[in-house]
Every structure is written in structure tokens, then in C-alpha cells.
Amino acid sequence: MKKLLLAFPAAVLLAAPASGGETIELTEKQQAKLDKQLEGRSPRKAQSCIDRNDQRKMTVISDDILIFASRRNAKTIYINKPPGGCSGADRYIMSYRRTTGSLCSGEIIQLIDNMSGATMGSCTFGDFVPYTKDLSVGSK
């Protein structure tokens, strides 16, 4: 069963509609995974691009929420909400053209089946919202 986001800080992150006015819904498992990633972090101003070479790992929370972890700065993660979602992001390989050294809002991602090599769909990145760990939180 799915539930509307009510927990903080995830509710702050996702208070705005995803696209077309709908509210993003997460399962309890997805919500717990998101809360764990955001624990002790606070949002900063959204960025249209992030350094492609600085990205250590991408975590798929849901079709609507992707998290990018920085290689150089473990305190910061980037939340991306693809406009219209990215159906299959958790099942398929994401492929994109390396035209610059950045991942940018509006960049098209192809979803590729690992076994057949077939393109299963595509989506685009939205803005990247940095969430940075506040070093004073939990250091009492």
C-alpha cells in the first residue's frame, strides 16, 4: 500500500508537485530509504547541473526520486526528480551521451535492458537539489 509523504524532511523535499500537479507517493519501504538518505541533511538551492565525474553512486528511491552521491564530498547528496518520473529506473541500466562533463536538467537518459540490450524507455533529469549534512546535528 502506498502512502502520501508526511515525514520530515522528506515532506519538505517533496512538498511540491512532481509534474502536472500530482503528489509523489512512496511505499513505506521507499519512504524509509529516503528518510535514511536525508537524515541530518538540509536542502540547498537547486542546481541545473552537477559534475558527472564526481558522482560515486546513484540510488533509485522510486520512479520519481533519484539520489546521486558525491565522490569528493560525502556530506552532500543530490536529489533529482525526473519530470514525469523515470519508469523502470530501478530495473534497467541508465545510458546517456557524454557531451559534457556534467549531468544536467533536461538531459535524456535511455533505459536499457541488461539481457537483451533493447531500449526500454527514456526519461529526462530534473534539477538537482543538494542536501548537505549539518555537522552540528547529532554531534552533541
Regions found by a protein language model. Give the residues of each.
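Bacterial N-terminal signal peptides
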Residues: 7-15
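Residues that line or immediately flank small-molecule/substrate-binding pockets and catalytic motifs
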Residues: 8, 62, 132
